[in-house]
Amino acid sequence: MNFVKPLIMASMMAVTATGAHAAAKFTPELLNSLGRVSDAQVSPDGKKVLYGVSTPNIENNNSNRELWVMDINGKNAVQITNTEKSETNAVWFEGGKKIAFAYPNEKGVNQMWVMNADGTDRRCVSNMEKDIEGFVLSPDEKKVIIVSTVKYGETTQDRYPDLKKTDGRIIDDLMYRHWNEWTAEIPHPFVGEFNGSEVTALKDVLEGAQFESPMRPWGGVEQLAWLPDSKSLIYVCRKKTGKEYAISTNSDLYQYDIATGDTKNLTEGMMGYDNNPAVSKSGKIAWLSMEHDGYEADKNRIFMLDGDKKVDLTADWDYSVDFITWSPDEKYIYFICPYQGTMPIFRMNVANRKVEQVAGGQYDYDGLQFAGKDLLITCRHSFLEPNEVYSFKVGKEPVKLTSVTDPIMNTLGDVKCEKVMIPTTDGKMMTTWVLLPPNFDPNKKYPSLLFCEGGPQSPVSQFWSYRWNLRIMAENGYVVFAPNRRGLPGFGTEWNAQISGDYSGQCMKDYLSAADFMKEKPYIDGDHMGAVGASFGGYSVYWLAGNHQKRFACFLSHAGIFDLRAQYCETEELWFVNWDLGGAPWDKNNEVAMRSYREADPKNYVQNWDTPILVVTGEQDFRISYSQTMQAFNAARMRGIPARMVLFPSECHWVTKPQNSILWQREYFRWLDQWLKK
């Protein structure tokens, strides 16, 4: 039987962020000025850390990522690049003497580059026709996998060469677009020789195949791995196209022999996502695996190959794993996963399957690398603090190594974050995060916001977001409460799975329970409570708008689903709606699906809408089409309800450009303040 043994106890249930001087106001401009720390890489000798810092430029409406190097103790941090474009995918090689990275060449095409560890002697070493999206050096550093795109299918100009200026698309099958781009090109892994100064003899591992690897939209180099002998590689692929691709999550791990081109399916017969291979120095292969085809939010298990046998190491672990890496001695697999409203670091003893927590507190951890045998490097953030680099040893408190965001964050007010347990209608206790404004006075009354999470199965952990930033909401005078309602990971598979086929069921009861619970707090102004959310959170807002019974004074929905029938017929990931809604709207004998379209469809309750609503969308959102938002806005205005729509022609499911982000935040608080601070 597995168990969790916390080696580090959180010192208190509430964390306070306090500025040393008079508090500054946390404005959208300040939020969008913060440097964004990511991708800490430990040098081979364990003495240095390489990391990136992306800095937005509000005036130019873009951002630029530069590379930094510091000692393993956080001292002597030096910026080693200062360029017009972003350096990405930076890794050490030649024992830490050099760094390889991706950067555009003089033609603007992203390529692989190398430089000395101090940033000098930059040289472009690849000559790909199209942008490279990432690369992985082999263990002997004599080969490299490069990810670039290849043409997908036949273009209109292929069919009609004389119509060179037509922009019409001829579409015969699914999935013709995905998330925020049309499927005109797909990624392939190319393997080639590398002598330290030039990449040659590149070969497309999937030459002639219309399969993608890594998998869109989230997949990167974590879906590629080398075997220790540098003679074989592993890639992740869902070898399906068209409709079969659109309804399936059945990916596999494939081992590819470079010399012969022979390919072996390592996960044959495993039906869900098989992903993110982690190979130990001796060649042990572990990976993340989901059980069910079509269920993208299934429990992510850790599997390991034992000869030809596939072993589930997490059969007794009831939580979904996000990230894995081997310890240097191969006795442990370290992993990060949602757990009770946070994202701690755990390790599993491979021999006896026992699990222990090695880094926790009210934080989320992001990535993990070893510096020697027992020192680990990671990034950490929370609702109150942006990402920074930390080091820790098992049994010791993490040590902060970078302070990129401190000059701004140290000027802000004393926002508090508390964990509150709220009873639900079915007798459970629901973990809810509550953020209190600066200079909080329990004797005063505050407007409040119910934060509705998206996903629908994404954790309400201690995330730091540059879009849905809960701290800036609290800094603007709101008590923010974020429930881990039914359907969120981190509380066992039963809690996570309950939402499937039941969008309007217990998860909505959980939201209403949280609202009612918070209204009983003496510091909550019960007449000025709002509900906000994006994606499934935006859907939740639409559903609550027709079923809240006067609980809320205003709503805000970003990229939410308004019409479930239309969503089924216009979205791209058909596996998603098949699993979550139960099936197609024309499948009249499918009671689960019929219940979804009958009881869970927000448009069925528009006649009950009576509350002001702000809706936001991006025209490049192919996950939840902007037409959903337009329907909701039109319905609200036709019913005489105060409403506003903010539409971004160039944005997708998220708002990413700095000036668009600032506009989003300004309209967000303008709307909330108008209706909740009267």
Spans of model-derived segments:
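Active-site-proximal cap/loop segments of hydrolase catalytic domains
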Residues: 474-475, 482-678
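Short, solvent-exposed loop/turn segments at conserved positions within beta-propeller repeat blades
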Residues: 59-65, 105-110, 181-185, 244-251, ...
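Cap/lid segment of the alpha/beta-hydrolase catalytic domain
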Residues: 241, 293, 404-527, 534-535, ...
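Beta-strand-rich domains and repeat architectures in extracellular enzymes and scaffolds
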Residues: 29-65
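Predominantly five- to eight-bladed beta-propeller fold
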Residues: 64-65, 146-208, 236-239, 243-252, ...
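Short loop/turn segments that connect beta-strands within beta-propeller blades
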Residues: 71-75, 116-120, 194-197, 257-261, ...
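A short loop-to-beta-strand structural motif that recurs across blades of beta-propeller domains
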Residues: 66-68, 111-113, 188-190, 252-254, ...
